[in-house]
């Protein structure tokens, strides 16, 4: 059955035949198979490689080495070029930027990243261990602070792997950037205050970590996360039966190193603050990350007096 049309005064026959539908469906099978093959090939981790940004001087040494290799056939003194190339190669291997990692003993550094209203704190220990405490931000849908802020900073620092990620609290502004970091930095351990199956996004994060073989740890009160000369420990009992607020059931982490200390209290409220002070928990710290992003329901005078910080940092955006 057909119908006749006229295009630019010329007759044109449009066929409506069962064979046409069969041909279209046959072609669609090929397209679907191609899409499935492309998806399966691109899915594994080995199809993409994420690396930290090399130091500018390493890039310079690389080009010197490349130049020495490429110009040997046309230079009258190839021995000199070989020496220059060898020196460049040795310089790349023993670059001060790499020596600080190989020899150890750089000072422990703590970086509070500006993610707006959220929390992302990087700790680099003297032994090379890298710990991220929280990694999230209150942001528009589709914006990933892990991909846009945290990962670029880590690459800028020359960090290609995170050893531990600690999530102090299961609000999204503490962890929604960590999905990306699990894939790109492959941490060995993920520390959580608890496993809350009532929060789908949080559950998806935990499930992804398990699929990647990451060890899931829910630490007890007083548990030591890092030891030796530097110590990172969990303060207070975040599992106490009387704690009904989700904010108060988060982790409070204290880092001490070289006579200095930093307190990461998550989103705890005044009630949990007073309990920490009442049992004489060692909370005195050089730096205090303001509880709950500086909220009026936290930051009690009792806690501020007990911590007595030299610096108070509020990780919050404009409202």
Pin down the residues of each PLM region.
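Non-globular, low-confidence helical/coil segments that flank catalytic cores
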Residues: 4, 9-319
């Amino acid at each position: 059955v057909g119908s006749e049309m006229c295009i630019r005064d010329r007759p044109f026959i449009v066929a409506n035949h069962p064979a046409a539908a069969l041909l279209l469906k046959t072609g669609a099978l090929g397209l679907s198979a191609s899409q499935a093959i492309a998806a399966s090939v691109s899915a594994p981790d080995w199809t993409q490689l994420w690396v930290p940004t090399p130091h500018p001087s390493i890039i310079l040494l690389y080009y010197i080495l490349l130049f020495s290799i490429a110009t040997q056939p046309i230079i009258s003194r190839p021995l000199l070029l070989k020496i220059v190339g060898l020196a460049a190669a040795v310089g790349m291997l023993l670059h001060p930027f790499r020596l600080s990692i190989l020899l150890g003993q750089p000072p422990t550094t703590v970086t509070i990243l500006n993610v707006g209203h959220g929390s992302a704190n990087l700790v680099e220990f003297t032994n090379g261990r890298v710990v991220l405490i929280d990694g999230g931000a209150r942001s528009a849908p589709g914006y990933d602070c892990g991909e846009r802020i945290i990962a670029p900073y880590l690459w800028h620092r020359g960090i290609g792997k995170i050893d531990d990620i600690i999530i102090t609290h299961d609000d999204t502004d503490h962890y929604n950037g960590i999905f990306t970091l699990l894939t790109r930095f492959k941490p060995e351990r993920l520390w959580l205050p608890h496993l809350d199956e009532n929060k789908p996004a949080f559950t998806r994060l935990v499930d992804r970590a398990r699929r990647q073989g990451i060890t899931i740890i829910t630490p007890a009160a007083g548990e030591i996360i890092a030891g030796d000369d530097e110590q990172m420990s969990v303060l207070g009992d975040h599992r106490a039966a009387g704690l009904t607020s989700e904010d108060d059931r988060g982790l409070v982490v204290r880092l001490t190193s070289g006579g200095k200390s930093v307190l990461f209290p998550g989103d705890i409220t005044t009630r949990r603050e007073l309990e920490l002070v009442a049992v004489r928990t060692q909370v005195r710290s050089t730096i205090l990350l303001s509880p709950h992003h500086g909220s009026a329901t936290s930051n009690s005078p009792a806690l501020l007096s007990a911590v007595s910080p030299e610096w108070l940092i509020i990780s919050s955006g404009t409202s």
